[in-house]
Amino acid sequence: MLFRSVWDETQWDREIHKAVKTLIHLRRTRTVLQRGRYEPAVVTPGGLFGYTRTLQDERMLILFNRTEQLQHISLPVDPQYRGHWRTVYPHEGTVANVGERWNLALPPKMGMIWEWSGR
């Protein structure tokens, strides 16, 4: 066979499949990810990329580490968005209490998403 069938589920990478399903679900259930204002948060030549999406009082931070190494980053935080941020991807529930700066460690080849949950 010249091309393998993408419909053959035995050939799927289950980890990627699960991640894509989770990201699709997040986008469908979070209006801020559909219509929120886009603002770049960080772009580095070394492979870090991030942005925020804001809609009324909702805000999400999306960060990607495209490098092969753990990356540390320190982001300034707007006064109105200081307080509690909760991870929503790749796992849900971890809460960070954020002040003037947010110091983060991003695993290699990983994307992470946080949701502002108030003060």
Question: Where do the protein language model's features map onto the residues?
Answer:
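Carbohydrate-interacting/catalytic domains
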Residues: 1-119
